């Protein structure tokens, strides 16, 4: 994820809803899967931007939670013990780190747990068609909207 992608995620969210007062789940705090390293993590500017827009942010990471709990920049973030509790009653979810446990989430789980099933997939780990079939609005960084069987998805890379 490059430096501009957190702001693109915010832009994609704002095209779907006003962020003020919305509960936004951020899945993945470490800069990459397999580490607890938060340095250079795209989650940091993303969370800061969401909080600035008035969103209530909840987050989960499989191994970076202990470090996140000690950081001042996570003081206003609800740090959840599982992706399931992070998704519960959220208005949107942002995938920031491609952890295997996030990749294994069945699309129906998003629709079942979330208030509004809006997923911004910053890592391109989910199939947009499977998301649409489960009633999830899928937005991906670097994709343009297309329509499939009446469902809006983003299935084509903007760069070719």
Which residues does each PLM region occupy?
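Structural/interface elements that position substrates and couple domains in central-metabolism enzymes
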Residues: 1-160
């Amino acid at each position: 994820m490059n430096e501009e992608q957190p702001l693109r995620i915010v832009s994609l969210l704002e095209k779907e809803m006003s962020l003020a007062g919305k509960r936004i789940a951020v899945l993945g705090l470490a800069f990459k899967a397999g580490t607890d390293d938060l340095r250079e993590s795209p989650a940091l500017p993303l969370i800061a931007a969401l909080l600035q827009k008035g969103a209530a942010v909840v987050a989960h990471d499989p191994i970076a939670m202990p470090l996140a709990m000690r950081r001042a920049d996570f003081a206003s973030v609800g740090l959840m013990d599982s992706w399931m509790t992070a998704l519960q009653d959220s208005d949107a979810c942002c995938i920031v780190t491609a952890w295997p446990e996030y990749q294994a989430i069945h699309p129906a789980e998003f629709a079942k747990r979330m208030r509004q099933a809006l997923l911004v997939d910053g890592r391109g780990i989910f199939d947009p068609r499977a998301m649409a079939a489960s009633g999830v609005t899928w937005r991906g960084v670097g994709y343009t909207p297309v329509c499939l069987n009446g469902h809006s998805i983003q299935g084509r890379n903007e760069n070719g």
